[in-house]
Curated annotation (Swiss-Prot):
GO terms for molecular function: rRNA binding; structural constituent of ribosome; tRNA binding. This is Large ribosomal subunit protein uL16. The keyword Ribonucleoprotein applies. InterPro entries: Ribosomal_uL16 (IPR047873), Ribosomal_uL16_bact-type (IPR000114), Ribosomal_uL16_CS (IPR020798), Ribosomal_uL16_dom (IPR016180), Ribosomal_uL16_sf (IPR036920). Belongs to the universal ribosomal protein uL16 family. It comes from Wolbachia sp. subsp. Drosophila simulans (strain wRi). Keywords: Ribonucleoprotein, Ribosomal protein, RNA-binding, rRNA-binding, tRNA-binding. Part of the 50S ribosomal subunit. GO terms for cellular component: cytosolic large ribosomal subunit. PANTHER family: 50S/60S RIBOSOMAL PROTEIN L16, LARGE RIBOSOMAL SUBUNIT PROTEIN UL16M. Gene3D superfamilies: Ribosomal protein L10e/L16. The lineage of its organism: Bacteria, Pseudomonadati, Pseudomonadota, Alphaproteobacteria, Rickettsiales. Binds 23S rRNA and is also seen to make contacts with the A and possibly P site tRNAs. One of its GO terms (biological process) is translation.
Amino acid sequence: MFIPKKSKYKKVFKGRIKGNTKGGSTLSFGDYGLKAMEAGRIQSKHIETARRVISRTLKRSGKVWIRIFPDTPVSKKPADVRMGKGKGSVEFWVFKAKPGRMLFEISSDVPMHLARLALEKATAKLPMKCKFVSNHN
């Protein structure tokens, strides 16, 4: 699971995910990628599940880059606890993805049809709409 080693603040406000991504919207490492089409919170377990699906589909060939990291803690109070008495403890970590953000990349030594299949399978494991992008036209 992806968890930061150290964080400046233990807990953060919920906030809103507004606008499009400022950076990280183009392919930087590989020739094929998975781009977010809508805003959403991606948990560390979603990233790990998508990574496993991609590596199994590619049969360990090629290189996979994970372009995101969950750096925002989400707190939750236990069940059957009354309101008040402070904020709950940190339950999991998320990455707040904006539309246009590149999530995963795959190297060019993998055939395009296999890369597309792997990234479409990974899309099913993520809580948002995504699309396949490539450097090849």
